[in-house]
Amino acid sequence: MRLSRALIPTLKETPAEAQIASHRLMLRAGLIQQEAAGIYAWLPAGLRVLNAIANIVRDEQAGIGAQEVLMPTIQSADLWRESGRYDAYGPEMLRLKDRHERDLLYGPTNEEVITDIYRHSVKSYRELPQMAYQIQWKFRDEIRPRFGVMRGREFLMKDGYSFDLDYAGAVRSYRRIMLSYMRTFQRLGVKAIPMLADTGPIGGDLSHEFIILAPTGESEVFYDAAFEEIDWSGASFNVDSDADLERFFQTITGHYAATDEKHDTAAYEALPEARRRTGRGIEVGHIFYFGTKYSKALNMTVAGRDGQKLHPEMGSYGIGVSRMVAAVIEASHDEAGIIWPDSIAPFRAAVLNLKNGDAACDAMAEDVYRRIGVRHALYDDRDERAGVKFADADLMGHPWQVVIGPRGAAAGRVELKRRRTGERVELTVEDALARIRESV
């Protein structure tokens, strides 16, 4: 993408309404534009990040056999009345009527719809277990939307659901999802600590939140320093091995970690003082086991091994995809701007031509741009001062900057800057491209 033609409206000044770093930087870097309170348009660079996160989520869900579906944003109120939640859900649920005066709602969550899908399709224990997920926009009418996409009214969520024959199977599904989430967050370039959490309006009796540590987090968190040493990739665990799942679960839950809602002061203070950690955290994922709460309410049954009808055990598993964009920025930025992990950056590299119109600079910049790939490089071909180009590249947070000036172009060399470390080295074009490729 050539920056001279790109819809990336960077801002020099910080918008007055932006209170936290991610909101400021997303507006300044041209990732989003506010359209109404808590509602944002995602501009091209922001959408690239959103799609990169969603694709990593999809990849890890496929790895555990979860099937992608797409459920409607507008749902029937009758289905929610059947579950008993239509009247119980608060004013954050947007209710509406169609032209025939039928009650509808903009779905804040999807337990009812997914259960309705499966009750019509799955009839026997032989068809279980099942896992399905979607990545879909939701709306919750927050009374005070704030902090940009961190707490907006419209947001993109990954919702996953499991259906199992019995409790043991449901716990196995819960653990498989937890392991897949650890791998997902590792690939997104963040550490997300699973912490005991409240089940909230979804219900259930087993729940973990996945928390990214950040000074602006909405929750106070308490955890064991052992979490600083855990292999977050889960690479040594096989999701299809019950023994590995048990070992993984004990590794994760064997150390104290809780949000303020579930904090056990006595258990925390039983830790050696040197291992006690506190901080602020941002919730980026939440998983629940809630048994037969919805399968009973919606009368979903399957024939068991003995022919008797039974209600499947269910779980619900969410990742805030749009919120993750803001959470990553909160955890990874500096005074100059965003510092994107390589895996979700809108562009792998910025190509900075410091002297537009110079034949050697133009030729080298075009060559580097095309060899990185026009989908993966942002070529700053604007007629701007070098300082403006450097500032915008730092603000937008590209993992690499390839700087091309007259002296270097004459010698066949470029300056390569790593955004995360600030390291600058002068290299041949071949060596610079090799470094960029190795980081992907």
UniProtKB/Swiss-Prot annotation:
CDD domains: ProRS_anticodon_short (cd00861), ProRS_core_prok (cd00779). It is found in: Cytoplasm. SUPFAM superfamilies: Class II aaRS ABD-related, Class II aaRS and biotin synthetases. GO terms for molecular function: ATP binding; proline-tRNA ligase activity. Keywords: Aminoacyl-tRNA synthetase, ATP-binding, Cytoplasm, Ligase, Nucleotide-binding, Protein biosynthesis. GO terms for biological process: prolyl-tRNA aminoacylation. Its main location: cytoplasm. It catalyses: tRNA(Pro) + L-proline + ATP = L-prolyl-tRNA(Pro) + AMP + diphosphate. GO terms for cellular component: cytosol. It is an enzyme of class 6 (ligase). Its EC number is 6.1.1.15. Pfam families: HGTP_anticodon, tRNA-synt_2b. Belongs to the class-II aminoacyl-tRNA synthetase family. ProS type 2 subfamily. Homodimer. Catalyzes the attachment of proline to tRNA(Pro) in a two-step reaction: proline is first activated by ATP to form Pro-AMP and then transferred to the acceptor end of tRNA(Pro). This is Proline--tRNA ligase. The gene is proS.
